[in-house]
Curated annotation (Swiss-Prot):
Name of this chain's protein: NADH-ubiquinone oxidoreductase chain 6
Spans traversing the lipid bilayer: 1-21, 24-44, 53-73, 87-107, 141-161
UniProt xrefs under InterPro entries: ComplexI_Subunit6, NADH_UbQ/plastoQ_OxRdtase_su6, Nuo/plastoQ_OxRdtase_6_NuoJ
Family per record: Belongs to the complex I subunit 6 family.
Top EC class, one word: translocase
Originating gene: MT-ND6
Gene Ontology cellular component annotations, sorted alphabetically: mitochondrial membrane
Keyword vocabulary terms for this entry: Electron transport, Membrane, Mitochondrion, NAD, Respiratory chain, Translocase, Transmembrane, Transmembrane helix, Transport, Ubiquinone
Source species taxonomy: Eukaryota, Metazoa, Chordata, Craniata, Vertebrata
EC number: 7.1.1.2
Protein backbone atom coordinates (compact mmCIF):
# COMPACT_ATOMS: atom_id res chain seq x y z
CA UNK A 1 0.00 0.00 0.00
CA UNK A 2 2.91 2.33 0.68
CA UNK A 3 4.22 1.77 -2.82
CA UNK A 4 0.80 2.50 -4.31
CA UNK A 5 0.41 5.77 -2.37
CA UNK A 6 3.99 6.74 -3.33
CA UNK A 7 3.13 6.05 -6.97
CA UNK A 8 0.03 8.22 -6.61
CA UNK A 9 2.12 11.02 -5.10
CA UNK A 10 4.60 10.80 -7.98
CA UNK A 11 1.71 10.93 -10.45
CA UNK A 12 0.33 13.98 -8.62
CA UNK A 13 3.64 15.82 -8.95
CA UNK A 14 3.94 14.88 -12.64
CA UNK A 15 0.35 15.96 -13.29
CA UNK A 16 0.96 19.32 -11.64
CA UNK A 17 4.16 19.79 -13.66
CA UNK A 18 2.10 19.05 -16.78
CA UNK A 19 -0.38 21.75 -15.78
CA UNK A 20 2.33 24.27 -14.89
CA UNK A 21 4.12 23.87 -18.22
CA UNK A 22 0.77 24.75 -19.88
CA UNK A 23 1.40 24.04 -23.56
CA UNK A 24 -2.23 24.46 -24.66
CA UNK A 25 -5.63 24.39 -22.93
CA UNK A 26 -6.24 20.88 -24.24
CA UNK A 27 -3.13 19.42 -22.62
CA UNK A 28 -3.48 21.50 -19.44
CA UNK A 29 -6.99 20.12 -18.93
CA UNK A 30 -5.64 16.60 -19.40
CA UNK A 31 -2.92 17.28 -16.83
CA UNK A 32 -5.53 18.57 -14.38
CA UNK A 33 -7.67 15.47 -14.81
CA UNK A 34 -4.61 13.28 -14.15
CA UNK A 35 -3.64 15.36 -11.11
CA UNK A 36 -7.19 15.23 -9.72
CA UNK A 37 -7.43 11.49 -10.28
CA UNK A 38 -4.20 10.60 -8.55
CA UNK A 39 -4.86 13.17 -5.80
CA UNK A 40 -8.11 11.39 -5.06
CA UNK A 41 -6.16 8.13 -5.16
CA UNK A 42 -3.90 9.52 -2.41
CA UNK A 43 -7.00 10.32 -0.35
CA UNK A 44 -8.34 6.80 -0.91
CA UNK A 45 -4.99 5.39 0.18
CA UNK A 46 -5.35 7.19 3.49
CA UNK A 47 -8.94 6.06 4.06
CA UNK A 48 -11.01 8.96 2.75
CA UNK A 49 -12.94 7.13 0.05
CA UNK A 50 -16.16 9.15 0.29
CA UNK A 51 -14.35 12.49 0.37
CA UNK A 52 -12.21 11.62 -2.64
CA UNK A 53 -15.25 10.53 -4.65
CA UNK A 54 -17.11 13.76 -3.85
CA UNK A 55 -14.08 15.93 -4.69
CA UNK A 56 -13.49 14.12 -7.98
CA UNK A 57 -17.13 14.45 -9.04
CA UNK A 58 -17.19 18.15 -8.12
CA UNK A 59 -14.01 18.67 -10.10
CA UNK A 60 -15.27 16.84 -13.17
CA UNK A 61 -18.64 18.53 -12.99
CA UNK A 62 -17.47 22.06 -12.36
CA UNK A 63 -13.98 22.84 -13.50
CA UNK A 64 -14.00 20.82 -16.70
CA UNK A 65 -16.86 23.00 -17.90
CA UNK A 66 -14.52 25.99 -17.60
CA UNK A 67 -11.79 24.18 -19.50
CA UNK A 68 -14.23 23.07 -22.18
CA UNK A 69 -15.21 26.70 -22.73
CA UNK A 70 -11.61 27.90 -22.75
CA UNK A 71 -10.52 25.13 -25.12
CA UNK A 72 -13.40 25.90 -27.46
CA UNK A 73 -12.72 29.63 -27.45
CA UNK A 74 -8.93 29.37 -27.76
CA UNK A 75 -9.00 27.22 -30.85
CA UNK A 76 -5.38 27.17 -31.96
CA UNK A 77 -4.64 25.75 -35.39
CA UNK A 78 -1.33 24.27 -34.21
CA UNK A 79 -1.34 23.82 -30.41
CA UNK A 80 1.98 23.30 -28.65
CA UNK A 81 2.45 19.85 -27.17
CA UNK A 82 4.72 18.60 -24.40
CA UNK A 83 7.31 17.55 -27.00
CA UNK A 84 8.04 21.10 -28.23
CA UNK A 85 11.32 22.68 -27.17
CA UNK A 86 9.86 25.62 -25.24
CA UNK A 87 7.39 23.48 -23.33
CA UNK A 88 10.01 20.80 -22.67
CA UNK A 89 12.24 23.51 -21.19
CA UNK A 90 9.48 24.49 -18.77
CA UNK A 91 8.95 20.83 -17.83
CA UNK A 92 12.67 20.42 -17.07
CA UNK A 93 12.80 23.64 -15.02
CA UNK A 94 9.73 22.69 -12.95
CA UNK A 95 11.00 19.14 -12.41
CA UNK A 96 14.40 20.41 -11.24
CA UNK A 97 12.60 22.84 -8.91
CA UNK A 98 10.52 20.03 -7.42
CA UNK A 99 13.64 17.89 -6.92
CA UNK A 100 15.49 20.77 -5.22
CA UNK A 101 12.60 21.53 -2.86
CA UNK A 102 12.21 17.81 -2.08
CA UNK A 103 15.94 17.62 -1.34
CA UNK A 104 15.60 20.58 1.01
CA UNK A 105 12.91 18.85 3.07
CA UNK A 106 14.18 15.28 2.63
CA UNK A 107 15.81 14.89 6.04
CA UNK A 108 12.77 15.46 8.25
CA UNK A 109 9.92 13.66 6.53
CA UNK A 110 10.04 10.61 8.78
CA UNK A 111 9.66 12.57 12.04
CA UNK A 112 5.93 13.00 11.50
CA UNK A 113 3.53 10.26 10.57
CA UNK A 114 0.65 10.15 8.14
CA UNK A 115 -2.26 8.20 9.56
CA UNK A 116 -5.36 6.98 7.83
CA UNK A 117 -8.78 8.46 8.49
CA UNK A 118 -10.02 5.29 10.20
CA UNK A 119 -6.95 4.54 12.26
CA UNK A 120 -8.96 3.46 15.32
CA UNK A 121 -12.02 2.20 13.48
CA UNK A 122 -12.62 -0.56 16.01
CA UNK A 123 -13.49 2.06 18.65
CA UNK A 124 -15.65 4.36 16.53
CA UNK A 125 -19.15 4.21 15.12
CA UNK A 126 -18.66 6.96 12.52
CA UNK A 127 -16.30 7.32 9.60
CA UNK A 128 -14.13 10.39 9.60
CA UNK A 129 -14.89 11.63 6.11
CA UNK A 130 -18.69 11.22 6.23
CA UNK A 131 -19.00 13.05 9.54
CA UNK A 132 -16.86 15.80 8.04
CA UNK A 133 -19.40 16.19 5.22
CA UNK A 134 -22.19 16.66 7.77
CA UNK A 135 -20.09 19.26 9.57
CA UNK A 136 -19.40 21.07 6.30
CA UNK A 137 -23.10 21.43 5.54
CA UNK A 138 -24.08 22.44 9.09
CA UNK A 139 -21.40 24.95 10.12
CA UNK A 140 -19.74 25.52 6.77
CA UNK A 141 -22.76 26.73 4.79
CA UNK A 142 -21.38 30.24 4.40
CA UNK A 143 -18.08 28.92 3.09
CA UNK A 144 -19.96 26.65 0.68
CA UNK A 145 -21.82 29.67 -0.73
CA UNK A 146 -18.56 31.65 -0.95
CA UNK A 147 -16.90 28.78 -2.86
CA UNK A 148 -19.82 28.63 -5.30
CA UNK A 149 -19.50 32.39 -5.85
CA UNK A 150 -15.74 32.09 -6.47
CA UNK A 151 -16.32 29.29 -9.01
CA UNK A 152 -18.84 31.48 -10.86
CA UNK A 153 -16.40 34.39 -10.80
CA UNK A 154 -13.65 32.08 -12.11
CA UNK A 155 -15.89 31.08 -15.01
CA UNK A 156 -16.41 34.72 -15.97
CA UNK A 157 -12.69 35.50 -15.63
CA UNK A 158 -11.75 32.62 -17.93
CA UNK A 159 -14.38 33.67 -20.46
CA UNK A 160 -13.08 37.25 -20.37
CA UNK A 161 -9.45 36.18 -20.73
CA UNK A 162 -10.12 33.97 -23.72
CA UNK A 163 -12.05 36.53 -25.71
CA UNK A 164 -9.00 38.09 -27.33
CA UNK A 165 -9.42 41.23 -29.41
CA UNK A 166 -12.91 40.43 -30.63
CA UNK A 167 -16.11 40.82 -28.68
CA UNK A 168 -15.41 37.48 -27.05
CA UNK A 169 -17.41 34.69 -25.58
CA UNK A 170 -20.39 36.84 -24.68
CA UNK A 171 -21.03 37.96 -28.25
CA UNK A 172 -24.36 37.85 -30.05
CA UNK A 173 -24.89 34.81 -32.23
Amino acid sequence: MTYLVSLFLLGLVLGLVAVASNPAPYFAALGLVVAAGVGCGVLVGHGGSFLSLVLFLIYLGGMLVVFAYSAALAAEPFPESWGDRSVLGYVVVYTVGVVLVAGLFWGGWYETSWVAVDEFKEFSVLRGDTSGVALMYSHGGGMLIACAWVLLLTLFVVLELTRGLSRGALRAV
